[in-house]
Amino acid sequence: MITAKSIEADNTSWAAALNEYETNRAGPLTAPLISTIAFPAMRHFADDWVELIDAADQRDIDQALAPGTPATVRAGYLAQRRYQIPLLRNPTEGAVEVLADSVGTLSVAMQRPLSRGSVRPSSRDIFDLPPLVDPRYCSEPFDCLVLARALLFNCALVRTRAMAELQPVAQEPYFCPDDLSDQRHVTDSRMLELARQYLATEFHPSGSTAMLPLDLGGVVDTELRVYGTQGLRVVDAGVMPMVLGAHLQAAVYAIAERAADIISDR
């Protein structure tokens, strides 16, 4: 990505780049963090997408949940899956995000994960110690299988005529196999291993204080009030019960505007 350090590495002074931006609103400082995104549906990048979704739909849901998950949260997760599985089958709903950063590096991000982690207090005083966060990535195997196929999709993208002219190469330890026709063989071996090993957060947390009925593990009601409290609302991405097939920012703005309307009407 383009940063002060990378600009200096290219023998362009930071002061000159800053002056170019302040004077003309041009130059390397106009480069965004992410320059290009796409949200392909399952059928657009996974040849065996029907088989993958069917297998996930039939799998024991407790595998995807943290040990000791309360019965209400389990019930809420089951309700989410009844909604989420059809979304994965929908040809107009993004299952992953393909994103290119400011220097053209392609990566992928899961948009419809079936795995569930946990966020628990580590102290009676919330300001004393940070919470215990366990994302439990790919506790539902479906997620990493999808990511592995999405990585192969990136390989196909860089072999298109338009991209090939730029002579892109895979960054180690990732690779692009010579033959992309047998997705299952490749993704169930080395590519799947890489997806599991290097999986990391995209720093877009959501869902920790879900808007759901209390008996489905919800934390806030439809007016964003925390159950069992007075005068306490949550107004952020935490109220989203499921990850969106999109970036969160616009949705958070909408939640905030709705919260303002609710509060001003009181």
Across the structure, where does each feature detected by a protein language model lie?
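C-terminal structured subdomain/cap of oxidoreductase catalytic cores
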Residues: 1, 105-163, 190-266
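Mid-to-C-terminal "cap/lid" subdomains and adjacent gly/pro-rich loops that border
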Residues: 1-100, 163, 167-169, 175-189, ...
